[in-house]
């Protein structure tokens, strides 16, 4: 009987030890899990805090422009109206280099000798004021070598001005075909330079679409909004019509149709449904301009040739006919392999169905190797090779469009 009691107590002790071990393991596991949870939570919280701090300078704080003082801390220079009035010669007509729906752009020289482009927003109408706020809020956080840089701003009473870097060679369109005010003296760009510009413009759009959350839709990309510096490096400009996309999957904005004839995507023109693929279509039109040297819409041409996309699209995928669309000024500068590759990219970008168009990241990846093999090796300390088929033009003095 005593032996049975000893055996019973041994079993009880074994069970107790087992329960204690499992309980200890469970508690330890819970502690580890809780510690990991706290670690992850703190890590995420820090990221959110950093993100909030980074973007807080661009948040809208009521209808006033007091937040511009915060934006100034992010590297933008604050100008007085008197300074900019002096820089532009009293906003004289001789210094006007662009006009738009929300104001005019003037050539200016600051006291330190820097050349700038100054956008004077229209004082009449609420829309102009809202446009100013949108541009400042966007541009204070959009920084890329392929986007036009905002140097500073002025906000005094009813005076709202933006100060941009000056682009010595003006808009891309000035170097592709004759335009009013250029007197046909603007130099034509060579093949290598056109492809380089195509890549840089694509990188600008890629940044807006892929590296900003939520993505920014330009909505009015065109050759006149792709500006060239003194070395013919390209930067995308004019975010006056830019819209922040939805943060939902496949984000889009629905709004009244704005844009420029010949560049507007079909689905946007018909429904007002705007997505990043709408920008891709506009980019495709610019790519066609680079290939053909033609304006997007010219009803003075022969029947069937007035609309660039309609005329070029059937030829872009035909190896025998694709050469028919090429700008005569480029003759002898390209290989058929290069033309076919670029034509294929353009054809995908201007597809009528938005879903069939590529992402701008795909466009960039397609152009990078092509441009790389065409560009000569640049020695350290020397500038990149950018060329025109004529001498530099004194008429190319444009900077951002209004």
Question: What is each of the regions a protein language model found here?
Answer:
Residues 203-216:
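Protein kinase catalytic-loop region centered on the HRD/HxD motif
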């Amino acid at each position: 009987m005593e032996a049975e009691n000893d055996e019973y107590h041994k079993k009880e002790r074994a069970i107790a030890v087992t329960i204690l071990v499992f309980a200890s393991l469970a508690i330890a596991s819970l502690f580890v899990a809780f510690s990991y949870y706290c670690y992850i939570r703190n890590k995420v919280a820090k990221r959110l805090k950093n993100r909030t701090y980074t973007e807080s300078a661009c948040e809208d704080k009521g209808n006033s422009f007091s937040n511009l003082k915060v934006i100034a801390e992010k590297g933008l220079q604050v100008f007085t109206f008197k300074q900019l009035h002096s820089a532009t010669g009293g906003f004289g007509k001789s210094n006007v280099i662009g006009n738009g729906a929300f104001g005019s752009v003037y050539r200016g020289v600051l006291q330190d000798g820097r050349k700038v482009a100054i956008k004077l927003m229209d004082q009449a109408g609420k829309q102009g004021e809202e446009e100013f706020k949108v541009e400042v809020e966007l541009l204070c956080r959009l920084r890329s070598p392929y986007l036009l840089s905002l140097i500073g701003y002025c906000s005094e009473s009813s005076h709202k001005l933006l100060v941009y870097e000056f682009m010595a060679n003006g808009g891309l369109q000035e170097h592709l075909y004759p335009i009013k005010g250029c007197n046909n003296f603007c130099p034509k760009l060579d093949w290598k330079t056109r492809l380089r510009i195509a890549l840089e413009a694509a990188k600008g759009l890629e940044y807006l679409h892929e590296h900003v959350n939520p993505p920014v839709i330009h909505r009015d990309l065109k050759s006149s909004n792709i500006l060239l510096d003194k070395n013919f490096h390209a930067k995308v400009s004019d975010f006056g019509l830019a819209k922040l996309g939805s943060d939902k999957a496949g984000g889009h904005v629905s709004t009244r149709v704005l844009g420029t004839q010949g560049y507007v995507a079909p689905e946007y023109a018909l429904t007002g449904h705007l997505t990043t693929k709408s920008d891709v279509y506009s980019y495709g039109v610019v790519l066609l301009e680079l290939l053909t040297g033609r304006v997007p819409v010219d009803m003075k041409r022969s029947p069937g040739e007035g609309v660039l996309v309609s005329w070029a699209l059937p030829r872009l995928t035909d190896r025998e006919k694709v050469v028919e669309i090429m700008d005569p000024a480029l003759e002898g500068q390209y290989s058929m392999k290069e033309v076919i590759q670029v034509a294929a990219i353009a054809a995908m970008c201007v597809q009528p169905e938005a879903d069939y168009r590529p992402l701008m990241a795909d466009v960039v990846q397609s152009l990078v190797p092509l441009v790389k093999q065409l560009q000569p090796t640049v020695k350290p300390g020397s500038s990149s090779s950018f060329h025109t088929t004529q001498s530099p033009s004194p008429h190319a003095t444009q900077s951002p469009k209004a």
